[in-house]
Amino acid sequence: MSESIDRVFVKAIGTIRTLSSRTGYGGLPRPPIENRVKLYGLYKQATEGDVAGVMERPLGDSPEAEAAKRKWDAWRSEQGTSKTEAKRQYISYLIDTMKQFASDTTEARELLSELEYLWNQISDVSPNDSSDSESNAGPAQLLQNHAQLLSRDISVVDDPITSSGMDPMYNPSFQRHNSSRFINASTAERLNSLSNYYSNLNPTPPLSSRRYQGSVTPRNVDFIKWQNDINNSINKLNHDLQLLANRRLQSSASDPLYSKRGSDLTHDDFVNDISSSSSNRRFRARRNQPLVSKVLLGTISLLLKLIKTVIKHVAIDAVIIAVLVAVIKRSIIIPNLISNEISLQKIHHSELESNSSIKGDSNGGRLTIVLPFINGKDFFQENSLLGKLLKVFHDYVDHVSRIRLIKRN
């Protein structure tokens, strides 16, 4: 019976690790801290026994010390409970907790139904029967049974062909998971050697001498067959769970954010508060933004850069245009120098008439240089840029004519 309890207990440990790997990012809520601490105390009592003599109560006022005290008190509350009874309570309490807090997803319901089915097969059997049979058995028989149980556990976990179809050394986290199980292969070999030693000291009588002692009956044979069927079913379930765990570990091996998942999670991780889960969820939400949002953000950023560049070039062009306008105005506006008629000094009428079209002015003998394309105010506006340029050109021609006349005179 103890062997069956151990098998279901191993299944419960695998179930809680699977649930822990789904908590925080798959929508599966964590149970309250009281439930987790209770499970922690039962787990420590089932695997290590009483806390007295193992460790002292932690001291300190820090949050870590308070959490350690809470876990130590939960372990201490199970003082005096046998390991087998602690395993039974652990399985039963885990099933009740899963019914309340881990029944929202299909995977969680499947895990719960599998664990509950296995538990119903052995929950009605009294633990006293198993304890009595163990107390009557010799040390060699106890060690042999325990070694067989552990060897069977190791064969399910460590067989690279039946568990994953590949070398488990390929994934470091898978290797840590195998080494962090309850016992390793070397310990099982030592237990086998101890059982052989006790068998040599107290050899077991042959089956013929025990045939009439009432130890083997049809009822016991049926029970053993039923127990073997249960063990085979559990082995198959563990094999399937290991395959699923290997797939998850292989898919998350290249992702540093989720490198600590699945079988890497311990009971301490399960008990600790999820203080950093909210920041992790925000980070994952940013990572998992839809493609449309990313494209929209990229387009907006490009538009902002384009607008900034256009404004910069427009400002530079405006400054250049302002400087050019100022230079043109300063070079064009010449007050009191532009006029349509220029009075000249009295010169010789014949020379001027030969060089240019000069008409005599009867008013005081003054002469006027006539440029028809400049004289017409109706043709060009005085304030226009072209009109001002033509006036400047007219003044220049008048100035050159004066110089030539002065030299000739």
Swiss-Prot record:
Membrane side Cytoplasmic: residue ranges: 1-313
The record's induction entry says: Repressed in glucose and ethanol media, but induced under peroxisome proliferation conditions in methanol and oleate media.
Q: What is its main location?
A: membrane
Any single biological process term in GO: fatty acid metabolic process
Q: What does this protein do?
A: Acyl-CoA binding protein which acts as the peroxisome receptor for pexophagy. Required for both micropexophagy and macropexophagy, but not for the cytoplasm to vacuole transport (Cvt) or autophagy pathways. Required for functional micropexophagic apparatus (MIPA) and relocation of ATG11 to the peroxisome-sequestering arms of the vacuole. Binds palmitoyl-CoA but not oleyl-CoA.
Q: Which family does it belong to?
A: Belongs to the ATG37 family.
PANTHER family in the record, alphabetically?
Answer: ACYL-COA-BINDING PROTEIN, ACBP (PTHR23310), COA BINDING PROTEIN, PUTATIVE (AFU_ORTHOLOGUE AFUA_1G12300)-RELATED (PTHR23310:SF133)
Question: What is the recorded name of this protein?
Answer: Autophagy-related protein 37
Task: Give the organism, scientific name.
Answer: Komagataella phaffii (strain GS115 / ATCC 20864)
